[in-house]
């Protein structure tokens, strides 16, 4: 009897945990189509209509972003990569596209450097230099923006940024508004 009671209690607890997790996930809004399509177009320069069709087909934003990266790296149309992905797992898709981890990483690096240059007008060679030093593209962008407002070099600003030290805090230490690294 005790075992049955314990088993029922565990099952009920499991239902509450699963139900609660589902409810919180259900409250999460999906990515707005226009925002998703515009963002991916700005990043990868693929056709907005084509991206919209793929988004409408039920592909999640993150999956579509991954499709774009692979298409960019392989220099193939996004729809062609999406058709491969419908049939195969990513490792097989990469093989069929001739993408090695190194080629994919190189293409991702190139796309990020190009994107920052196109969208923010930052020097491509400098962005590339700092990203090759292991800094994330958003850190490089913010340090380059911030360097315009103070007497510190980009290298010095990147050195100030740690996981604990936020960009807004660095701006304040330099006597600048918290958002100085954003423009």
Where are these regions (language model features)?
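Positively charged n-region of N-terminal signal peptides that target proteins for export
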Residues: 1-6
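A broad, structure-centric signal for solvent-exposed, well-ordered loop/edge residues
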Residues: 7-8, 71
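General marker for long, soluble alpha-helical cores
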Residues: 24-183
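Short, intrinsically disordered, low-complexity terminal segments
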Residues: 18-23
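Bacterial N-terminal signal peptides
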Residues: 8-17
């Amino acid at each position: 009897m005790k075992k049955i009671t314990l088993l029922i209690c565990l099952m009920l607890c499991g239902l509450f945990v699963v139900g609660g997790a589902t409810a919180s996930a259900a409250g999460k809004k999906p990515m707005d189509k226009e925002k998703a399509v515009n963002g991916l177009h700005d990043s990868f320069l693929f056709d907005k209509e084509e991206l919209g069709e793929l988004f409408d087909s039920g592909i999640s934003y993150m999956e579509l972003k991954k499709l774009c990266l692979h298409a960019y790296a392989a220099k193939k149309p996004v729809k062609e990569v999406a058709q491969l992905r419908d049939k195969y797992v990513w490792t097989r898709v990469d093989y069929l596209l001739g993408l090695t981890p190194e080629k994919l990483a190189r293409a991702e690096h190139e796309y990020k450097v190009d994107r920052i240059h196109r969208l923010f007008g930052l020097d491509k060679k400098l962005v590339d230099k700092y990203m090759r030093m292991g800094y994330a593209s958003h850190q490089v962008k913010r340090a380059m923006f911030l360097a315009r407002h103070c007497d510190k070099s980009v290298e010095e600003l990147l050195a100030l940024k740690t996981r604990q030290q936020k960009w807004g805090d660095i701006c304040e230490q330099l006597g600048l508004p918290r958002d100085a690294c954003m423009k």
